[in-house]
Design a protein with these regions (language model features):
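Long hydrophobic alpha-helical segments that form multi-pass transmembrane helix bundles
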Residues: 150-229
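Juxtamembrane membrane-water interface segments that cap and precede transmembrane helices
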Residues: 49-63, 193-210, 272-280
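Internal alpha-helical transmembrane segments
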Residues: 82-160
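N-terminal signal-anchor module of multipass membrane proteins
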Residues: 2-77
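Solvent-exposed interhelical
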Residues: 94, 134-147, 230-252
């Protein structure tokens, strides 16, 4: 690493707010898509203006946040690893193997989250891919950056695309993801609580992990984790003139890149006749346009956060972000109770617009809980358990 002198890293306010923003964005996406439960009111039974509004809500929420909120979350996961690793190094301790234990604990929270979120959990993916941070923790900045770029290039998809050019019969392996999601929807419709939970933590987790393979999420998450660690090393979230220039340049470059990347994605993924092109080059450009827009969001947020008015406006996101694990898992639990047959079964009565407003209302309830909890506790409920168990056996 570059640093020759190790000092404890202070808490960076913008990171908590940005994490809160990411969890809020995830919440809105989850509510609009009914937590991957595709049951909605019949459009024919709704007034025309509401159908138009519903389509607009879906387009805006998914266009702004789908695939980007998780990317922000992944960046901050890598950043948090750097902070924890550096803080322990400042005390003369090696956090490396404690971090592996922490990842193992994360699988427990992933199971808890998956129990009420059919095939939608991302925490298990993070627990698996997080091992890459352990591997590169002592690498130089240059080595980490080069490796991150290689991952972000989506090499697996390019391999299959190039192979298809030489062999027209080349096909991606059929992982059966579509059939798994169909089966998960049927289990959800049954309304049998214990069957619902069991299928979610078994078949659902399998479907989620295999979906991530086809969507290019594994290698992208590796790259994002490493970029987050580099952001920590370079202290790019700490306010300074140099960092402001960096984020302005990042905003300009990624905003310019997003347009053509998105158009190529439409050509290759949405309208291409060849399935192999859609599943390979199409996926690559889909991930790249999402990556570019992710940094448009991050850079914009960091730059706006230097303005006191924006900082006050987003103050509720800081407390929300400090309890991101609790808020992420609890939204799955309550989402199941709201939309699924095991609970109120409101999915057939809630279109995109109503679902979005339910999500917004639930966000404010979570914020209220976060503020109340923070008055009495240092960590959120799940954060406190994770912290306590992380350091079990330490002196």
């Amino acid at each position: 690493m570059r640093q020759t002198t190790i000092s404890k890293s202070p808490r960076v306010e913008v990171v908590d707010a940005l994490r809160g923003f990411a969890v809020l964005a995830i919440l809105l996406v989850h509510h609009v898509e009914h937590f991957i439960y595709p049951v909605y009111p019949d459009p024919a039974a709704l007034p025309g203006w509401l159908n138009v509004l519903n389509e607009g809500v879906f387009t805006v929420v998914f266009g702004l946040f789908a695939g980007k909120s998780y990317s922000i979350f992944a960046l901050l996961f890598g950043f948090t690893f750097y902070i924890q690793y550096t803080n322990q190094l400042a005390k003369g301790k090696d956090f490396s193997y404690r971090f592996l234990w922490r990842l193992l604990l994360l699988t427990l929270f992933a199971t808890l989250n998956a129990a009420f979120y059919p095939a939608g959990d991302v925490l298990l993916l993070y627990a698996i891919v997080g091992i890459v941070l352990f591997i590169v923790r002592k690498w130089s900045d240059k080595a980490v950056l080069i490796t991150a770029i290689l991952f972000l290039l989506q090499p697996v998809e390019w391999y299959h695309y190039i192979a298809s050019l030489f062999n027209p019969d080349h096909q991606l392996p059929d992982l059966g993801v579509g059939a798994m999601y169909t089966e998960m929807a049927e289990h959800t419709k049954r309304g049998d609580l214990w069957n619902f939970i069991w299928q979610n933590v078994t078949l659902g987790q399998k479907a989620s992990l295999l979906w991530a393979v086809g969507a290019g999420r594994y290698v992208q998450t590796c790259g994002l984790f490493m970029l987050g660690m580099l952001i920590g090393r370079r202290k790019l979230f700490v306010p300074s003139e140099a960092n402001t220039r960096f984020w302005i340049k990042t905003l300009i470059v990624t905003a310019i890149a997003f347009g053509p990347l998105y158009q190529i994605k439409v050509l290759l993924m949405d309208t291409a006749d060849s399935a192999i092109v859609r599943q390979t080059a199409g996926v690559v450009f889909d991930m790249w346009q999402k990556f570019a827009f992710t940094f448009v969001l991050v850079a914009s947020f960091v730059l706006l956060y230097q303005w006191e008015g924006f900082k006050r406006f987003t103050s509720i996101l800081r407390s929300y972000g400090k309890m991101s694990l609790t808020n992420y898992v609890s939204q799955s639990f309550f989402g199941a109770l709201i939309y699924f047959p095991i609970g109120l079964n409101l999915a057939p009565y809630c279109g995109y617009t109503v679902s979005m407003f339910i999500g917004i209302a639930f966000f404010f309830l979570q914020v209220r809980f976060c503020k109340w909890w923070a008055e009495h506790h240092k960590h959120g409920p799940l954060e406190g358990i994770w912290h306590k168990w992380t350091w079990v056996g330490s002196k």
